[in-house]
Amino acid sequence: ILKCKDPKKTCMTILTDKEETGSDGNTGLNSSYLPYFIADLAKVYGLEGRNVISASECLSADVNAAYDPTFSEPFEIRNSSQINYGVVATKFTGARGKSGTSDASAEFVGRVRKLFDEHNIVWQTGELGKVDGGGGGTVAQYIANLDMNVIDVGVPVLSMHAPFEI
């Protein structure tokens, strides 16, 4: 985003904290910070914050758990990301059926895929382990709850949260 010269649309990076502990507090994405910030920004241009949020799209930069052949039980191999096969687009997250979930629309996923392909970005899809196998939380659900299109995009990580990650 730093190299983006004279963009046609507003571009921004939002950095937040507390993702691993529920995204609560005034620095977490589950706070009112993001909608208030966008509302203040929109007001400068004579726009309504809620309309700006609804028209926005977000790539949530979060890692994905790569398939681990030495600890394969939590993974569904055909739906897992692999190390060295590009960034991972994670269409949906959540557990217990559809609890705590975010699910990017097919249209938004299509636009992201097209963007990757047009810019020769190597990418893959993957889920965060077997459904209801535990883990798999991201901040995408908080962004989606604002009525914003969002998808998780990040690198696959082997042995996530272990003392030694790859």
Description of each model-found segment:
Residues L2-M12, V155-I166:
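His/Asp/Glu-rich mid-to-C-terminal helical/loop segments that flank catalytic regions of hydrolases
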Residues I1-L2, P35-A39, V109-R113, A140:
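Predominant activation on well-ordered alpha-helical scaffold segments within soluble catalytic domains
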Residues L2-V88, G134-G135:
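Acidic/histidine-rich catalytic neighborhood of metal-dependent amide-processing enzymes
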Residues A66-F71, F75-A162:
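Active-site-adjacent substrate-binding region
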